Regions:
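Active-site micro-motifs of SAM-dependent methyltransferase domains
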Residues: 83, 100, 131
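Flexible loop residues that form catalytic
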Residues: 41, 98, 185-187
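S-adenosyl-L-methionine-dependent methyltransferase catalytic module, highlighting the catalytic core
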Residues: 103-111, 121-231
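A short SAM/SAH-binding and catalytic strip from SAM-dependent methyltransferases
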Residues: 92-103
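Basic phosphate/pyrophosphate-binding loop/patch that engages nucleotide-derived ligands
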Residues: 114
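Conserved N-terminal segment of class I S-adenosyl-L-methionine
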Residues: 1-88, 92-94, 109, 224-228
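A generic structural signal for alpha->beta connector loops
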Residues: 51, 73, 119, 176-179
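Generic enzyme active-site microenvironment
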Residues: 33, 56, 98, 123-126
């Protein structure tokens, strides 16, 4: 897999990243967490609010150099999700927007299971191929189909596949994981770039209320949300 050095650039993307991390903290358990695909550690330090032991794993040494400068309470390690080996097991393993990038998502999930304590949890979050935004894009003729991967998604973001809630659950079951929870996060009516401009114009207080409203609105509409999550044991 070619690793693309991409970080969240606009303010809306950063809001989304924080919401995803908060969701992982809500669903996680125990005292230790492994954050796979941590990148430059933009959001990994948030886990210190809940977990005593926080470890970040990423394939990019350039990202990890940046992450290590920001917080010395977190151990950052280099490794690929499908093949990493650690002499440690964790109460919670979190993968935020990662499964759509890797060569073999089932192998990654199986490897995570080997690093999970008994009774621990694996948390997976991915973009939703069936989101309202993508379905509108199909109707507008911008996207060929909900499962179509655009050149930008493939070449810039490094996406290799799309997920619906059904296909995400199926990959978890193929990895012999028990799915104990699932849902959606963030009803998103417009693309990130446009929402980013709107939020910037309205200011942080408005954006905070807007994001909370999008999360609340999406709670009963998981299939329509921008992101999907599953909780596995």
């Amino acid at each position: 897999m070619k690793y693309l050095d991409h970080v969240r650039a606009n303010e809306f993307d950063q809001w989304v990243g924080r919401l995803q991390t908060i969701k992982a903290m809500e669903l996680g358990r125990g005292k230790s967490i492994l954050d796979i695909g941590c990148g430059v550690g933009q959001f990994t330090p948030m886990f210190l609010q809940k977990f005593k032991r926080v470890v970040g794993l990423d394939a990019s040494e350039n990202f990890l150099k940046v992450a290590r400068k920001a917080n010395n309470k977190i151990e950052y390690l280099a490794g690929w999700g499908e093949t990493f080996k650690l002499n440690e097991k964790f109460d919670t393993i979190s993968m935020n927007m990662l499964l759509e990038h890797v060569d073999d998502p089932v192998a990654l999930l199986k490897n995570c299971k080997q690093h999970l304590v008994r009774g621990g949890r694996i948390l997976v979050q991915v973009p939703n191929a069936n989101s309202v935004t993508r379905r509108i894009g199909v109707l507008m003729g911008i996207i060929d189909g909900i499962n179509h991967i655009s050149d930008k998604e493939r070449n810039y973001f490094g996406h290799k596949r799309t997920y619906t809630l059904g296909t995400l659950v199926a990959d978890c079951k193929r990895a012999r994981l028990k799915v104990v929870g699932k849902g959606g996060l963030l009803f998103k009516p417009l693309p990130n770039e446009i929402l980013g401009r709107i939020c910037k114009a309205q200011g942080k207080e408005w954006t905070h209320k807007f994001m909370n409203a999008l999360v609340a609105f999406g709670e009963d509409r998981p299939e329509d949300c921008a992101n999907l999550y599953v909780v596995c044991e």
